[in-house]
Amino acid sequence: MLNNKEKQKLRKIAQGQRALLQIGKDNISDNLIKTISDSLEAHELVKISLLKTASIAVREAAYDIAAATHSEILMIIGRTMVLYRRSKKNLMEL
């Protein structure tokens, strides 16, 4: 669990990043969850955008993905979400 200062620092880092993954008309699949989990392990911080063709709401998608990948939702802005999960390598110093 992150405290507010850590969340603020991670949000600041995420602001400068582009979306690493996109969710389209296929919505959330097992393959997408595995890809997101692998990305979280490699980068710890993942920005995901939801395309207009997706039939799932942004908040619902964020909660489903966070639950499936055991990650935390840092922020949801528009159709973009940012997820964080500490990796075994502990890449980011908070």
Describe these PLM feature segments.
Residues 1-94:
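Positively charged, polar, low-complexity stretches
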